[in-house]
Structures are given as C-alpha cells and as structure tokens.
UniProtKB/Swiss-Prot annotation:
The keyword Cytoplasm applies. Residues 865-875 have a biased composition (Pro residues). It comes from Homo sapiens. It is found in: Cytoplasm, Cytoskeleton, Microtubule organizing center, Centrosome, Centriole; Nucleus. The gene is AKNA. Residues 1-394, 507-562, 659-682, 775-942, 977-1005, 1095-1165, 1180-1211, 1252-1329 are annotated as: Disordered. Residues 89-99, 778-792 have a biased composition (Acidic residues). This is Microtubule organization protein AKNA. Residues 1-10, 25-35, 71-83, 276-285, 1135-1147 have a biased composition (Basic and acidic residues). Its main location: cytoplasm. Residues 771-804, 911-932 are annotated as: PEST. Residues 1115-1123 bind DNA. GO terms for molecular function: DNA binding. Residues 263-275, 879-891, 929-940, 983-999, 1303-1317 have a biased composition (Polar residues).
C-alpha cells in the first residue's frame, strides 16, 4: 500500500497515476503495505464484487513473493508512507469511516501476530510474485491507478478514497484501506456513477500500489460485495481472517470479513500507533498482497475479463489490460517491482518491495493518524500507482511546476497511462517526484503557498473593506458628521473638500448638513476667520449631519415632513449665509477665507438643492421634475421651498460677486484702501453696480467694487469700482482659479464671462447702431491718438492736462500707456501736473491710490493742488475724489457705474472686446472718440474694456471710462501716467488694453478715470463735449487725457467717475438701452453735424480751449498736431483742472485751479459724491485760475469749473441717477459753450473734438480760442470754454451743470467760464455716459444713458443750460473743467423731461436686465442642480 499510497497521492494530485503509482509501489514498502491494506479492504470489495478465491490465491501467490518486498516497504517506506500516506490515509481514513483507523489499530495490534508472519511469508512470495505482480500489478495498478484515478476522478473523488487520493496521503495503505472500505462503500454507494466500480476499483487502485492491490482495488471496485466472501474464503489463513475481523473494524463500511482475513494474513506485526497504522496499512497491503495478489494472479490469469468487469464494471477494458499485464508480467512485475524498489526504494522508500505490501507494512493506521497532509490528498497515491506500473519509467526531470502540472493532470492521464504503457506516465514525472513523499511534499508546499496567498489575499480584502468602511467614516478631517454623511453617501462637499473620489456618498447624504460642514472643515481657516461664519459653518455642519439623516429618513417621512425638514435646512443655511455675509461685510474674513466659506456655502446649497430634487423624485418617481428643484407636488406643492432654495442660490451668487469684487479690488495697486473697504463693504449687489453706486459717485464705484469708500475712497471707490469691475472680472477669474474646485464657481465664472461677452456684444451692438458716430469718433480718436502720440511726450500726467496740446496728446496716448510714462513724457506743464500728482502720487497716488483705490491719481491731484495750485489736500482728497468723482460724476457716473457692473462680468475678458472700442480712435463713440467717451455706449466698449481691465468700473460702457478715469484714474495716474509717457504713441485702445493688462484695475481705472474726466469735460461743453466724447473715448483708452493733466487731475478726476460709474451700473435693459441709445444716437448725429461744423471751424478756438483736459489729452494724443495750441488751451483748460497752464503757462496757472477744479470737480476725485461738492469747491479756485487763463468770466467761470476741474465741469448739470442715486453732471448749455462748452458742443469744442480726434477740444485749457469760438450747437463762445475746456472736459456734464448751476455759483471765474461755456454749448450737454457722482450737486436725477449703458454708443444730451442743473454747475465749477469733453460727444440737447424719459427707459432697461439676470441665475441653478443630480446618480451607480 505504500506504493499504492504513493500512487494514490500522485493520482490525487494528478501527478502521475499509473506510472507514479507504480513508482510509488516500487519506491516503498508502504506501497506494499498499502497493497496489503488496500488488498484487505480491496479484497473486501473484491469479494463483494469479484471472486474472492481467485483474488486470494493471486494475492497469496503474490504475497509469497511479497516478503522480500515486505521488508523493503515495511521499515521506512511504511514509516514514510505512514507519515505521508499516513496523513493521506489518515485523512482518507477520516474521510472514510474512521473505521479504518480503528481497524488499523486493532489490525495493527492484531496484525503483528499473524500479520507479520503473513507479511514475511506473503512478502517473500510476494517478493517473487511481487516482482511479477508488482510489474503486473504495478502496471495493472498503474493502469488501474489511472483507471482508479479516473474512476475516482470520474467520481469526482466523492468517495473517501477519492478524498484520499485528493489528499494523496489517504492513498497510503490506510488510504487504500479506508478508501477501499469507503470506496467499496462508495463504490457501492457512489457507484451510481459509472465509475463507482471504477471508484472501488480506484480504491483498488490504491491497493494497486501493489499489483494485487491494483487488482484487488479493481476487483473491489466491482467485487466489493463479494470480495469479503472471497477474501474470507481465500484468506482462510489466520491472517486473512484476522485481517478481515480487524479490517472489518478498519474497513468499517467495508465488509469486515475482508479486513479480518487480510489482517489474519497481514496482521502479524503489532506496532505503535504509527506502526500500527503502518502495520494496518501493511496488513491491508499484506492482505492485498497475499490474497489480492493471488486473486490478481488468479483473476489476471484465471479470469482476466471477470477481473475487469469486477474491477470496473464500466472500466472493465482497463482492467483487462492490467490483468493481461499481470498475467504476462508476473516475473516482469517482480523485476519491475525490484526495479521499482531499487529506484523508488532507493530514492524514497528504497527498502521494501514497492509493489507488494508487507504484512508488517500493512499498518495503515497512520492514514487516520496523519491528517497533516489532508490538504494534500490529491491523488498522489494513484500517481504512485502509476510509478509502480512504470517498470521502464525513464523519468524526464522536469521543473516542479511541470511535475505538479503533470501530477495534477495525471489523474486524467492515469487512465490513458493505464491503457498505454506505464512508461509514459513514468517519463512524465521525475524520480525526485516519483516518490509519493516528494510529490506530496511538492504539492503540499505549493498548496501551502497557495493557502498562504489566499490568506494574504483574504486579509487584504478584509483590510480593504475595513479601510473602506473606515474611510467612509473618517473621510472628513473636520467633524464626524461629514464622515457620517460619507457613510450615508451624501458627502459631495466632503469628498470634494478632501479630494476623495467618493462622489456618490457625498451626493447620497452629504449636502444637507455635512456639505456645509465639510465646507467649513474644508475651509477650516474660514470658519475661524469669519467668526459668525464659523458658527454658521458649525451649524451648517450639524445641519449637514442632520441632512443625511433626513435623507435617509426622508423616504420614511411624509411629504410634509420632508418639506419641513428641507425648509428648516434652508433656513439654517440662510442663517449661515447671512452670518457669512455679515462677516464679509465686517471685513473679518480674509479673501481666501471668504472664498472657502463661500465654497462651503455653495456646496451646502448644492446639497440642499440635491436633497430637494431627491425628495421631489421620491415623491414623484414617475413624474419628471417640473423644475430644477423638482416637480411641485405633495412635497413642496407650492414650490415655496424651491423658491427659497433659489433665493438662497441668488444670495450666494450675490455674495460671490461681492467676494469677487472684494478680491478684485485689491488687485488695483491704488485701490488698496478701497479694496480694504470693499471687503468690508459687501458689494453683494455688485452685479447691479448701478444700484450699488446709487449713493455718491464713489458709492457707485465703491458699491460696485467697494461701496464703503466715500471721499478719499471716492477716488478709491472710483478706483475700486472700476477696480472692482476689474476685480470682479478678475475675481470671477481668480474665483475660478481660487476655487476651481467649486463647479458652481466655474459655472459662475462662465456666467460672468457670458455676461461679459453679452455686455461686450451689446456694446458692439450699440456701437454698431451708432456706427456712423462710432466711425467718426474713431476717426477723431485716431486723430486724437495721433495727436496724443505726437504730443505724448508733452502730455501731462494722468490727472494733469498737458500744458501744451502736444502734452495733452501725449497725455491722452500715455494714459492708456502708463501714467508714469506719460508723466515722464509730459512736458513741464505735464511735469508740473505730474509733480503735483507726483507729490500726490507717492503719498496720494500710492497712499491715496492704495488707500482710496485709484484715488491716488486724484491723490496726486490732491497733493498736487498745493503745488500746482490745486486746492490743498482737502480738495486734493476730495479733489482726488472729486477729480475721480468729477469724472465719475460725468463719465464715471454713467460709465463707471455701468461699467463696474459689466466689467465685473467682462472685466476679465470682455474688456478686451471693449478694447477695440476702448481705443478712442477705434471706438470714439457716435461722433468720434470724444463722443465715444462721452457716450457710455460708445465709450463703454473702449473705456469699458480699459475699465474692465483696469478697474472694471469703466467696464460699464461709459462708466467704464469714468471709473477708469475717475475710479482708477488715480491709479491710472500713478501707473497710467508712466504709460502715457512710455506709451505716448500707443493707441488709446492699446493703451487702455495695456493699462488694463499691465496696470490691471489700476491702469484700467486710470483710463476709465481719464474717460471720466474727458466725459466730464465733454459734458461740460456740448460742442466741447462732443469733442470731449471723442477725447473721452480716446482718453478712456489711453486714460491719457485724464492722466495728462496731473495737477487738475484731482479736480478732473472727481469729474464723472462716481456718477458715471453709478449710472453705468446697468443701463437697465436692452430695450431701454436701445431706446436711449437710439435717441442719443439721433441727437448725437445732430450734434455730430454741429460738432463737425464746429470742429472744422473752431479747431483753433478749440485748441485755444483746452477742450476739457481729458478730451484734450485724449485728442492731443490722438492728434497732437491738430491743434497744439488748441490742445494747449484745451489741455490747459483741462490742465487747469489737472495741471497748471493750459498751453503751459495758462495751464500751469490753471493747474492749481485745474487741480482745484478737479478737486473742485469733486465728483471726479471725491468719487462722484464729492464730485459736485468738493471737486466743485476746489474747482472754483482752479476755475478761477482757469477762468483767468481763459479770460472768459462766464465761460471762464464754467470753464474754470471745467477747466479748473474738467471733472467738475461748470457747464455740467448735476443729475442724480434714479438707479444708483449718483449725481450725474451734464454740461449745461452755459457750461458747454465754455471750455467744456466746447467739449459738450462739438462746435464749441471743435478743436477739442479735433484734439480728441483732431485736438478740437482744447478750448477748456485753450485760453480764448475756444471762448472766441461759439459753438453752433451750444452757441457758446469757444475761447472761454477753452480755458474751461479742461474743466468742461474734466467735468463736461459737471461743467455744464456747474456752468448752469455755478456759472454764477462757482467762483466768478468758473461761473464766468461756465457762463461763457454754457452760452456757447447748447443749453446743456447731457452726457449720458458720464453721470457725475453725488459730488456734483445734481439738481435732478440725470442718468446719462451712456454712462448707464455699458454699451459703446455714448449719447451726449444737450439740455438747456437751465434745465441741466445749473446748481451742479455752480458746485461743479471746482471741477476743473475735466479734459475737454472727449471728442465731441454726440451731444443731444435734452430737456429734463427728456432726461427723465431717458431715465425711465434706462430704468426699464435695467429692470429688464435684472430680470434677465435673475432668469439666467435661475436657469443656471436649475442646470447646476440637474448636473449635480446626474453626477450623483452616476456616482451612486459607480460607488
């Protein structure tokens, strides 16, 4: 059985069935023992199935030969097999009825007596027969082993023996016995399969380790039932009978007669339990060997066929082969057995006769005792059986893998091997693996490794599962609630924050509460930074935690409960939003904290929406969601909750806009304070800049970017506003950059971009509507740009008006280039203005700019006022504020306000679009760059581009220019002046673009401010205003016009920046805008005709008039050659606002006045609010100077206002924007004629127009030329306006207002200028684009359609001097006539009633725009919710 065990082992693993079994039989006595054991139980089987007498005889004969083999297998083989096959047999015995162990023990105890004798006696004969039978039985056993393996395999190793084979140990003697017993049982029981006999036979195969074993096994397979009888008969010998009795115990299921007989024959040795087991195996083997061999011989010889039939029933063909082999191979078997013993014994068992079991070695007990190899039961014994078969077993040494493969395949191959010569199987397995032990060891090792790997894999899986669970629980570093939400699977925010790829979990539960909490946790710094917000985030965290539960509970909850739960969540979320907003407003949160907090809130809101949608889906599973929030139904039937969620989303958007504005404002170098205040100021309404700036001009700017700044912030706020516009745009961009992780942020950014694009398109559309005017303005702007380029070196700094036309030109060009450059390139007057501005610049521009935003330029003007004669710092601050305000009020009011809004949307990108319009040449407005500047629509693209890029305030069509001029003017001055110097020749559009890009909000604001000034100057004088429009359009781009007059810049800066910015908040709606634009275009066309006439005729006069400094600088840059003198005067008049001396002398004289004028034209510097008041006051001095310079007392007064502070154009009428409440200054008819009168009136300011386009509007600074010239439109004399020119240009509207209002009210000079101006320009230049901020005391709420409209067409309304608030003009006188109104803005004379109508139309337009915006937001929210839904669904599926 040792061999059979081995073979069985091999067969089990599938190593080599026939040959391997054979080898095993040869290798060890264990095979013999196995044979005896398997014979005993096989005989039992055989006896049932086959004629036991024959089998016994064969076995006896074989056993007679066995003795030699007996010793060989007995000593070590038995032990070996006992150990290995003992394990296998033990396993098999276990697999079998543990009877085999019992029988093995008893047989062992009992076997020693007779078993050993029989062993000796049987082994000796079996030595002889063994050799023969070993060959035969080896072959037959190998074949039978194959067959048995096949049968066992065929049975699927169902039988214990199969198990034994599988274990490879059970196939040891005990394995064979047990298998024999059980196989007999199984063969009897399992025989249901065709292989059941084969199985018995395979169990016989186990015994086939020994030839007789194989025969017995075969017989047993068939003759299980008869075998006991046959064995009893054949084994009458005590051993057999004894064997039968013990084997009965051992066999258990097998008839015990066979075991007793076998035991009688193989019982002799009784040994220790192991020995007993071995003994039992041997006994079994003995019994097999003695009796089964006899039987084998008998059957093989006597009844070869009966044997096969007995053996296999269905496998009879296989049996017959083994039988003939056995018959023919008795001796060969002995030889084979000897060879097998020598080979297999030497290698492994090399002791006993491999093929015959020794009675002593029949101790199969170990099979039961050695379960250690249970796992390796694979039919190794069968493989061993094959070994025994392979007398010629040339081993092909193969790698263990190959051997194992063969062993595994051997079970299937065993049958074939049996059919074929056993040599084939032998060659397949190397000798080292021939032995069952080696094969078993190898298989054990492999299996152990496999189990080890399986264990590791299982551990890894468990670890992974645990990690997954743990990760779900601990996804968030913040509170455990996020983890809980993750568990719930609703942690979109948490996963997002933690960058976990668990989208579904977040979607599952995260959003309600944890979403915020993860937000808070994600922005850990934010909660702490925000204070209130931190608690809010904490509350949101609990809310989130609660939401997941709700989500789980929601299904169970009723619709009402769900609705209530969501409503509570929404209320909590709202409280958090409000707390966060308060924190932001309080300025307690850093920008990054704000962004983080907003992201968290956004995530929480998204989660809330998702929860709502989920609830809706649950409530209406079959109904598609009617809305983004889900279909109304039992759950939220009135969709109130949906509306609330939407409102929350809108609040978040506004908050985001405010945050963006706050973030963007810091970008401008000069709007630090504005930014600082801006964060404090929640520009939540920043989207609606018009409403935001509604207070003062600074307010619009501030509101847009930072409502907080006022006076100092007026410039700053003008700066911040444009800056904010830029900031907002940038903020949109930076927001996207800073919070790219927030999909909503991306969507918002896209929305902002789309809005910007939309605004840009609208601007272009409006510009296209006013294409003729735009072309004219472009031409004018080009001329102005040329002038600017020519006179770029001469142009004064950003705020200062060029002392000479050339300087003004340079200034115009430079503003878009760089304030500093312009400053450097400007001539002495420019230097003076620059000095003033510089004096303001380091402290003012830098400090004020940083403090006030772009008020720095104004601040320079502030500092400059003392130096240049501008009012002291109060005017300076206000002057800076006024100057900006003045510009803001004029340009800024409409442009800044409107632009800031749009810039927010398009500051980042649309302003580029604007750029084409930004260039005064490219987009001068309706009638040239001046008109473009004057006209927010026309200007807006160019200014707005600059503004958006610069400050974003100018982003609004006209307000853009103003913010750039006013809001960002200080910055523009600081940074823009260099550009002017550096880029005198740079096209305005380029300059603006450059400003926008290099200076960012600062330069952008500077151009805006320049535009504002220009607008103010243009607005100051209708004719001049038209030029101013050109200039403004030009200037806004270069901001050179504004920057040229540094000294008056403060006065000019205040000009329209604030109001303009305010007005431009929103040109309300397209319809209103279009209507207003059409009206403006019509009037502008009329004005254009007049201006063209004026421009051609009074170019000289215009040059004489500085044509408000702004207009003049822009034009001067555009066309320095057109009227250097005129420019000088225009610029001087604006310079008067900004810098001293229009031509240099007058401008220098005016500079103090001009700066004062700008200071006076507080609107500019004072940010719209201060514009009228303070800038006007400083403007009065400037205006006085200017008027002196201009020498036109009425116009000089107004132009002084204009000239003194173009920003505070005396001719302007101050209107209070109904939307923003900003004061907008329109040139009063009186103011228009004067320097600004020229600006407001193309005829009055033809030179300015030329200066802007062809240096036409030089009259404001121009001494008498502009005054001398009488605008056909305004009927004002051009020469006084020239002096005012700067003032009028600076504050075209202001001047108009100032002239009207302050023609007598401002300083006498200013008043005289204004008077002169106003008489000259048409009744009043209503500069829609430039709505002076509150600074100009607006008598009425005039909203320049242009300033309001962010679109290019800028319309200049000439209202009668009377109608246009003359009071503002009086107040505006301080507004040193801002740069002459940019090229002749297409001035439209509008009565207050017309203005009101326009206001109404614009208001409707704004309302429509707001409605569109809200609708867009709602759509975006719906789309976002749907997207989140889809993502969550996908995530849930994937998760």
């Amino acid at each position: 059985m040792a061999s059979s065990e081995t073979e069985i082992r091999w067969a089990e693993p599938g190593l080599g069935k026939g040959p391997q079994r054979r080898r095993w039989a040869w290798a060890e006595d264990k095979r013999d023992v196995d044979r005896s054991s398997s014979q005993s139980w096989e005989e039992e089987r055989l006896f049932p199935n086959a004629t036991s007498p024959e089998l016994l005889e064969d076995f006896r004969l074989a056993q007679q030969h066995l003795p030699p083999l007996e010793w060989d297998p007995h000593p070590q083989p038995d032990g070996h097999q006992d150990s290995e096959s003992g394990e296998t047999s033990g396993e098999e015995a276990e697999a079998e009825d543990v009877d085999s162990p019992a029988s093995s023990h008893e047989p062992l105890a009992w076997l020693p007596q007779q078993g050993r004798q029989l062993d000796m006696t049987e082994e000796e004969p079996d030595g002889t027969l063994g050799s023969l039978e070993v060959e035969e039985a080896g072959e037959s056993s190998s074949r039978l082993g194959y067959e048995a393996g096949l049968s066992l395999e065929g049975h699927g190793n169902t039988s214990p023996m199969a198990l034994g084979h599988g274990q490879a140990r059970g196939w040891v003697a005990s394995g064979e016995q047990a298998s024999g017993d059980k196989l007999s049982e199984h063969s009897e029981v399992n025989p249901s399969v065709e292989l059941s006999p084969a199985r018995s036979w395979s169990s016989g195969t186990v015994s086939l380790d020994h030839p007789s074993d194989s025969l017995d096994s075969t017989w047993e397979g068939e003759t299980d039932g008869p075998q006991p009888t046959a064995l009893a008969e054949t084994l009458p010998e005590g051993p057999s009978h004894h064997l039968l009795s013990p084997d009965g115990r051992t066999g258990g299921s097998v008839a015990r007669a066979t075991p007793m007989e076998f035991q009688d024959s193989s019982a002799p040795p009784a040994q220790s339990p192991q020995h007993a087991t071995d003994r039992w195996r041997r006994e079994t083997t003995r019994f097999f060997c003695p009796q089964p061999k006899e039987h084998i011989w008998k059957q093989t010889k006597t009844s070869p066929k009966p044997l096969p039939s007995r053996f296999i029933g269905s496998i009879s063909p296989l049996n017959p082969q083994p039988r003939p082999t056995r018959q023919g191979r008795p001796l060969p078997r002995q030889g084979a057995t000897l060879a097998g013993r020598s080979s297999s014994n030497a290698p492994k068992y090399g002791r006993g006769q491999l093929n015959y079991p020794l009675p002593d070695f029949s101790k199969v007990g170990p099979r039961v005792r050695f379960p250690k190899d249970e796992s390796y039961r694979p039919p190794k014994s069968r493989s061993h059986n094959r070994k025994p078969q392979a007398p010629a077993r040339p081993l092909i040494f193969k790698s263990p893998a190959e051997i194992v493969q063969e062993v595994l395949l051997s079970s299937g191959e065993a049958a074939l091997a049996k059919d074929t010569p056993p040599a084939h199987p032998i060659t397949r397995v190397p000798q080292e693996f021939q032995t069952p032990e080696q094969a078993t060891e190898l298989v054990h090792q492999l299996q152990e490794d496999y189990h080890r790997l399986l264990t590791k894999y299982a551990e890894a899986e468990n670890t992974i599962d645990q990690l997954r669970l743990g990760a779900k629980v601990n996804l968030f570093s913040d509170p455990p609630q996020p983890n809980h939400s993750i568990h719930t699977g609703m942690v979109p925010q948490g996963t997002k924050v933690l960058s976990f790829t668990i989208p579904q979990p977040r979607s599952a539960e995260w959003w309600p509460g944890p979403a915020e909490d993860p937000q808070a946790s994600a922005a850990s710094g934010w909660p702490s930074a925000r204070g209130d917000l931190s608690p809010s985030s904490l509350t949101s965290m609990p809310t989130l935690g609660w939401l997941p539960e709700n989500r789980d509970i929601s299904e169970d909850q009723s619709s009402a409960e769900q609705t209530q739960a969501l409503a509570s969540q929404a209320s909590q979320f709202l409280a958090k939003v409000e707390s966060f907003e308060r924190l932001i407003q309080a300025g307690r949160l850093m920008p990054q904290d704000q962004v983080k907090g907003f992201q968290r809130l956004k995530a929480a809101h998204a989660a809330l929406e998702e929860e709502y949608l989920k609830a809706c889906r649950e409530q209406h599973p079959a109904q598609p969601l009617a809305g983004s929030k889900g279909t109304p139904g039992r759950f939220d039937p009135r969709r109130e909750l949906e509306a609330e969620i939407y409102r929350l989303g809108s609040c978040l958007e506004e908050l985001k806009e405010h945050i963006d504005q706050t973030q963007q404002e810091p970008e401008p170098p000069g709007s630090d304070s504005a930014l600082d205040s801006t964060p404090a100021l929640p520009c939540l309404h920043q989207p609606t800049h018009l409403p935001a700036p509604s207070g003062q001009a600074p307010m619009p700017a501030i509101k847009t970017s930072c409502p907080e700044p006022a006076t100092t912030t007026a410039a700053a706020s003008t700066g911040p506003c444009p800056l904010h516009v830029n900031v907002e745009v940038s903020s949109g961009n930076s927001e996207v950059e800073d919070r790219p992780q927030d999909p909503l942020a991306r969507l918002r950014h896209k929305e902002l971009q789309m809005e910007q694009v939309y605004h840009g398109l609208m601007e272009r559309y409006l510009s296209v509507k006013s294409l003729p005017e735009a072309m004219r303005m472009e031409e004018e702007e080009e001329g102005e740009e040329e002038e600017e380029e020519e006179g770029g070196g001469d142009s004064l700094e950003v705020d200062g008006v060029a002392a000479t036309p050339g300087k003004a030109e340079a200034t115009r060009v430079l503003p878009r280039q760089c304030p500093v450059q312009a400053e450097k390139s400007h001539g002495a007057p420019l230097e003076e203005a620059t000095e003033k501005m510089v004096s303001m610049k380091p402290p003012g521009f830098q400090a004020s700019l940083a403090r006030d935003g772009h008020m720095s330029g104004l601040g320079k003007a502030e500092a400059a006022p003392p130096g240049p004669g501008v009012p002291p710092h109060p005017p300076g601050t206000k002057s800076a504020a006024s100057h900006q305000s003045s510009m803001t009020s004029l340009e800024g009011s409409g442009i800044s306000e409107r632009l800031p809004q749009k810039p927010l949307h398009r500051g980042g990108g649309p302003h580029l679009e604007e750029t084409w319009m930004a260039s005064p040449e490219t987009d001068s407005g309706f009638v040239g760059s001046e008109t473009s500047r004057v006209s927010p629509l026309t200007q807006t693209p160019e200014h707005r581009l600059s503004h958006i890029s610069t400050a974003g305030t100018l982003a609004q069509p006209f307000a853009a220019s103003v913010p750039r001029d006013g809001a960002s003017y200080p910055k523009a001055r600081g940074s823009l002046i260099p550009r002017r110097a550096t880029e005198p020749s740079t096209p305005r559009s380029q300059a603006q673009r450059y400003l926008s890009s290099p200076s960012g909000p600062l330069r952008q604001r500077a151009p805006n401010f320049s535009l504002e000034r220009t607008l103010a100057a243009e607005m100051a004088v209708p004719g001049s205003e038209f030029e101013g429009h050109k200039r403004i359009s030009e200037q806004p781009l270069p901001n050179k016009t504004i920057s040229p007059p540094p000294a008056p810049a403060p006065a000019a800066a205040p000009l329209p920046c604030g109001p303009t910015e305010t007005i431009p908040s929103f040109l309300l709606t397209r319809a209103g805008r279009d209507q207003a634009i059409c009206e403006l275009q019509e009037e502008v066309s009329r004005l254009r005709l007049r201006l063209e006439d004026s421009l051609h005729q009074p170019l000289q006069g215009s040059p004489t008039r500085p044509a408000s400094a702004f207009d003049r600088p822009a034009r001067t840059r555009g066309r320095p050659a057109d009227s250097p003198a005129t420019w000088g005067s225009h610029y001087g008049s604006k310079s008067t606002e900004r810098l001293p001396g229009e031509p240099r002398g007058e401008e220098q004289i005016v500079p103090p006045g001009r700066q004062r004028a700008r200071s006076s034209s507080v609107p500019r510097e004072v940010l719209r609010l201060s514009l009228s008041s303070e800038s006007e006051l400083p403007s009065l001095p400037l205006f006085s100077e200017k008027s002196k310079t201009t020498k036109d007392s009425p116009q000089a007064a107004r132009d002084g206002k204009r000239g003194v502070g173009s920003a505070g154009w005396p001719d302007r009428v101050t209107f209070r924007g109904q939307y923003t409440g900003h004061e907008y200054h329109v040139l009063s008819p009186k103011a228009v004629p004067k320097g600004n009168g020229t600006v407001s009136c193309p005829h009055c300011r033809p030179i300015r127009t030329q200066d802007a386009g062809g240096a036409v509007t030089g009259d404001p600074l121009g001494p008498p030329p502009a005054d001398t010239l009488q605008c056909p439109l305004c009927g004002q004399v051009g020469s006084p306006p020239e002096a005012d020119g700067p003032g009028s240009a600076t504050s075209g509207a202001e001047k108009a207002t100032t002239r009207r209002k302050a023609s007598s009210t401002p300083s006498p000079k200013q008043r005289s200028k204004q008077a002169g101006s106003s008489p000259r320009p048409p009744p009043g230049l209503w500069y829609l684009a430039t709505a002076p901020p509150a600074p100009a005391p607006p008598a009425f709420a005039y909203i320049s359609s242009v300033p309001i409209m962010p679109y290019p067409p800028a319309a200049v309304y000439y209202a009668p001097a009377g109608p246009t608030s003359a009071q503002p003009a009086a107040k505006w006188p301080p507004t040193a006539s801002p740069p002459p109104a940019r090229r002749h803005r297409h001035s439209i004379q509008l009565d207050l009633g017309d203005l009101e109508e326009l206001n109404k139309a614009l208001s409707r337009a704004v309302q429509a725009a707001e409605s569109v915006r809200s609708t867009t937001r709602q759509m975006r929210s719906s789309l976002s919710a749907d997207l989140r839904q889809a993502h969550s669904l996908r995530g849930s599926c994937l998760f």
